[in-house]
């Protein structure tokens, strides 16, 4: 269970770190991210802008909490909560027929849709699994090879998550 926890922890930390980097890579990128939240009209404009800032802060908190060994359970909880909020927002927007590009990782022009909901649910399940694995791993001692394998699996998973829009376009075109 220890290696499963490490994989889930690294996966979520990597995905959120890449998401943050894509959103804050420049003033225009951050503006596009905030605008993509506002244009969904889930909340009033001012509240949507504050929600965009809060979501970015929650992503950053997830990365920090997952990185520190004594805050891992809280990191998983914050990650799952953040993913739940993001998924809920996407679902509300889809029900209202509103579309905006997914600026989750930066400059994508793919509109938010069902694949993004599924992606977020899989990531949330990874967070819940990681929390359960953390609780079950107790005082287990990690072997370097096991840690390396878990980190490689997390890196592959993060790559698939981040490039999901491109992969879907490639295989559905």
Identify the meaning behind each predicted range.
Residues 1-173:
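Membrane-interfacial helix-loop segments of redox and metal-homeostasis proteins
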């Amino acid at each position: 269970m220890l290696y499963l926890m490490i994989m889930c922890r690294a996966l979520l930390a990597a995905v959120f770190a890449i998401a943050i980097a894509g959103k804050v890579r420049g003033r225009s990128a951050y503006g596009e991210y905030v605008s993509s939240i506002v244009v969904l009209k889930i909340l009033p404009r001012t509240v949507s802008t504050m929600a965009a800032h809060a979501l970015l802060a929650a992503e950053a908190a997830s990365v920090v909490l997952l990185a520190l060994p004594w805050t891992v359970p809280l990191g998983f909880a914050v990650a799952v909560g953040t993913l739940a909020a993001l998924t809920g927002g996407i679902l509300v927007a889809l029900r209202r027929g509103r579309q905006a590009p997914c600026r989750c990782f930066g400059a994508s022009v793919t509109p938010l849709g069902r694949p993004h909901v599924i992606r977020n649910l899989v990531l949330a399940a990874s967070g819940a699994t990681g929390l359960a694995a953390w609780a079950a791993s107790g005082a287990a001692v990690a072997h370097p090879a096991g840690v390396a394998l878990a980190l490689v699996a997390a890196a592959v998973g993060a790559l698939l998550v981040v490039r999901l829009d491109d992969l879907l376009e490639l295989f559905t075109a």
